[in-house]
Amino acid sequence: MDDGLATGATMVAAARWARSRGASRVVVAVPVGPAATLRALGREADDVLAVEAPETIFAVGEWYGDFGEVAEAEVEAVLGAAAEPSEERVSIAADGVHLVGDLTLPPAALGTVVFAHGSGSSRRSPRNRAVARRLNAASLGTLLLDLLTPGEEADRARVFDIELLADRLSAATRWLGFRLDTATLPIAYFGASTGAAAALRAAAADPSVRAIVSRGGRPDLAGDHLSVVRAPTLLVVGGRDDVVLELNRGAASALRCPHELVVIPGATHLFEEAGTLDQVADLAAAWFRRHLAAGDGAA
């Protein structure tokens, strides 16, 4: 993309560079360019788009009413608003099984948030998907993941095996590190119920994890690993979820990382009350953007 073409030399160089970096499809888009130059670019690009294609052009600026400079940030904002997130069903090898997940990456993602749900839930949970959509809108990638296979979910011992769940979460994190589109993105965890304990335990063993959010979680089940966690951690609990709230207060006192405990008034364990899940999603988005964008994961 350019503000216009004259000789087209810089666009040819850009197209060739994109090919050298492995681009499978190169599209050139300009508001104006000489017809002959556009035809020549057809040999370098898969598609060439132009609003105006005069036979000759002396200066690009003559085709503009206002040829003032446009900041790169403004261009990125426009492209980001217009682009759709990529969505992919994935399979991750871990502990001799294959875990199924849904990976969504918005353009210019700030990082990838891996979801660890609790017992009785799944990656298809409407609550998890609602939070994921809010994170995607905030330029955060999401991996909704089932940490157990369908057969394992019937085994209550595995459902509450925090060590196993944490190991699976760590395997998914390593898998993201091998993908071209996620390898350079920082990682964060969003855990619910027992999934929060798995997220904290996995983060305790991996200082590269930048941030954690627990929704109605059981961080107490992470035990002694709580004091080892370095990632900034946000604990969100419903004000009417009395037992879990007390467990979170106890867990918060064991954390040595930067952390906050936020209570959502009127909310019960599943945040089913009107507007309460939206509050969780907004808090999570702000927490992740703050710590992923700042690059200050461990403190």
Role assignments for model-derived ranges:
Residues 21-86:
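PRPP-dependent phosphoribosyltransferase catalytic core
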Residues 242-247:
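Conserved alpha/beta-hydrolase "acid-adjacent" motif
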Residues 180-193:
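Alpha/beta-hydrolase fold nucleophile elbow
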Residues 229, 235-237:
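Short beta-strand/loop motif that positions the catalytic acidic residue
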Residues 267-270, 275-299:
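Catalytic active-site module of serine/aspartate enzymes centered on a nucleophile-bearing elbow/loop
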Residues 9, 190-203:
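Glycine-rich nucleophile elbow surrounding the catalytic serine of serine-hydrolase chemistry
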Residues 255-270:
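Catalytic histidine neighborhood in serine/cysteine hydrolases
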Residues 92-182, 270-275, 279:
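Serine-hydrolase catalytic machinery in alpha/beta-hydrolase-like enzymes
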